[in-house]
A protein has these predicted regions:
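Structural recognition of the beta-strand scaffold that forms the well-ordered cores
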Residues: 46, 89-91, 122, 201-204
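Short coil/turn linking the two alpha-helices of tandem helical-hairpin repeats
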Residues: 82-84, 89, 129, 149-158
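Glycine-rich, histidine-containing beta strand-loop boundary motifs that form or position
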Residues: 74, 79-81, 86, 92-94, ...
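Aromatic-lined, polymer-binding surfaces characteristic
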Residues: 71, 87, 91, 131-139
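Short edge-strand/loop segments of extracellular domains
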Residues: 94-98, 175-176
Length: 229
């Protein structure tokens, strides 16, 4: 097995392809833990924003945008988790002394929550925070991907909805994004730090080599990618 910086390169590639095996290794553990840390922060943001808005509405638009971003990122995190591991614990609030451990929830329920969160994100996000932060189109994009996934996975569909229903739902979300972005001329330039948040980017992770020691970006980079090729 190839190694890179002490990490299993094959597992990182498998994670990128959403074919991670359910065997223990440090990359799997880090990805699982990392996504749930993100979810915990989203849960905290959602709860705190609700508390603040109950006390004051001085910046309701800004707080709504924060909550919308949290709902979107939580949906994205669960979409990543359930595609990798199937049934996973569904945390929608911060743990307390009486609620420290959760059993797994069926993937069908996870997808229902993803859809609910993404729809909430669309209703709340307004683009107040500008470049680098998700906008409602990111949630439209996520919903389109979710609906395409459900169109081809009958066991995950909501009762009463068939394949063509989900393809139509995917189209309705995708068309909301159409015309808002444009493709770059040089595909390889998407993976350079000089072309981040380009005209093609609906939403991307804001990773800085100066600010954090993270290899998360490897999971979203083409396999064996080399700069300029």
């Amino acid at each position: 097995t190839g190694k890179n910086g002490g990490n299993n390169v094959n597992n990182v590639n498998n994670a990128n392809l959403f074919s991670l095996k359910p065997t223990y290794d440090i990359d799997s553990e880090n990805m699982w833990g990392g996504l749930y840390r993100v979810i915990a922060r989203c849960n905290g943001a959602i709860e705190n924003v609700s508390t603040v808005l109950e006390a004051s509405s001085s910046d309701e638009s800004g707080f709504n945008d924060i909550a919308g971003q949290a709902y979107f990122v939580r949906a994205w995190s669960y979409f990543s988790l359930t595609r990798l591991w199937g049934d996973v614990p569904l945390w929608l609030s911060l743990p307390n002394n009486e609620n420290l451990h959760l059993a797994t929830s069926p993937s069908k329920d996870i997808y229902a929550q993803i859809i609910s969160d993404a729809e909430m994100a669309i209703s709340l996000m307004n683009g107040n925070f500008g470049t680098g932060y998700p906008r409602q189109y990111a949630a439209n994009m996520l919903l389109a991907k979710v609906y395409m996934t459900l169109a081809t996975n009958p066991d995950l569909r909501a009762d009463g909805l068939g394949e063509m229903d989900y393809w139509q739902l995917a189209y309705e979300q995708a068309i909301q994004v159409y015309g808002q972005y444009s493709l770059v001329a040089d595909y390889s330039s998407l993976f350079t730090d000089t072309n981040e948040n380009s005209s093609e980017s609906i939403w991307e992770l804001q990773i800085s080599q100066d600010a954090a020691n993270s290899q998360m970006g490897r999971n979203f980079t083409p396999w064996k990618y080399k700069l300029g090729q």
